[in-house]
Amino acid sequence: MRRAPALVVLMAAPVIATAQVAPNRATAYLHPTDVRDARALWVNPAGLGVLREASVYAEVAVGDPGARGRLRQINAGFNARGLAFGYQRDIFDAGIRGHTYRLGLAGASAGLAAGFATAYYRGEGTKATGWDVGVSYEWRQGLALGTVITNIGQPVVRGLRQRLTFIPGATWHPSAIPTVGVSAHARITPDSVAAYAFGVSWQGGQRGGGSRWPVAIIARLDTDGGLRRGAFALGLSIGNRDRIGAVASTPGDVSTIDGVSLYGVSTREPVKRR
């Protein structure tokens, strides 16, 4: 059996067949400071409280797309003004199935948001619980800072201990071109800097603009602690409040596409009363 590189298992592994623990697919292409819909439950729970919105999403991930492609992950969830729930089903080799149930709560005030999420791991004799806590802050106009502490309690899931990880990050939208976002974050374990991630995004047809079907593009590069390329993700989405998108993942050398996911997100912000 071929062993997957540790970096890929950590960051993009929902499509990796040999892993017995699969991160949520959204963690392979989003950053802790650039997600504010229901997917924040898996990336940074503080993002659930930033907009006080209601949102639902669903995503399907396939590994090794093509003639030998296999369904690897199905996940879905909702956020109701900071109260969120999500479910993730993983399909591994040898008929192994994993189930993760996640509950989150977040709130925000004056640009500062904080939240927590608890994960319940089940399936194949597994019964474990882990916690994440996160904060985000709109430090200046166009600059968001945030951090997440994941795997508090270091749960053991199907024989693998989930390491306590500190994830600081930032997203910057230049005032001259606010439709462009530049993001970066690091994954730090108690004994080392495990990985870095760098991304750029572009959003066309902002709310209130003239485009009915705005297009957004995201790109993200993941490296190990020595800045050696480990994974690359490229995504395209169409829509605004109701959005559909696709994300493709490759190894660091971009030699092949090893995973593709399709998702849909629907968001509604509260109507201001007169």
Positions of predicted regions on the chain:
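N-terminal, post-signal peptide beta-strand-biased segments of exported outer-membrane/organellar beta-barrel
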Residues: 17-82, 258-260
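Cleavable N-terminal export/targeting peptides
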Residues: 1-24, 253-274
